[in-house]
């Protein structure tokens, strides 16, 4: 009977040790993921800055993520180039205006 108790105690100890290592690995993975998210948050392109070379990296605004808006620019030589900047699309501006107005009315 004593041998069975010793074996059971040993198994419980091994299982708890291996599960705690698994949890530590999980926490390390979560930490790395959070650090990667923070780094991408730092690398986003602010409002009114150029996003011609990286159109999907605009930062978030108050309610929505800014969109890369492009226009065609004609230089003095007659050459056409595309220039893009991060900005708020008109329908997002309208939604922000309605939400702001609602906050003023309803507090």
From Swiss-Prot:
UniProt-annotated location(s): Secreted
Propiece residue ranges: 21-41
Residues of the signal peptide: 1-20
Name of the molecule in the record: U1-lycotoxin-Ls1s
Pfam families reported for this sequence: Toxin_35
GO CC terms: extracellular region
Main location: secreted
């Amino acid at each position: 009977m004593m041998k069975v108790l010793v074996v059971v105690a040993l198994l419980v100890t091994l299982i708890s040790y291996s599960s705690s290592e698994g949890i530590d690995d999980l926490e390390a993975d979560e930490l790395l993921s959070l650090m990667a998210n923070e780094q991408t948050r730092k690398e986003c392109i602010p409002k009114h800055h150029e996003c011609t070379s990286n159109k999907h990296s605009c930062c978030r605004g108050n309610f929505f993520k800014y969109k890369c808006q492009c226009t065609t620019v004609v230089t003095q030589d007659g050459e056409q180039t595309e220039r893009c900047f991060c900005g708020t699309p008109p329908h997002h501006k309208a939604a922000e205006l309605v939400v702001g107005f609602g906050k003023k009315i309803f507090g």
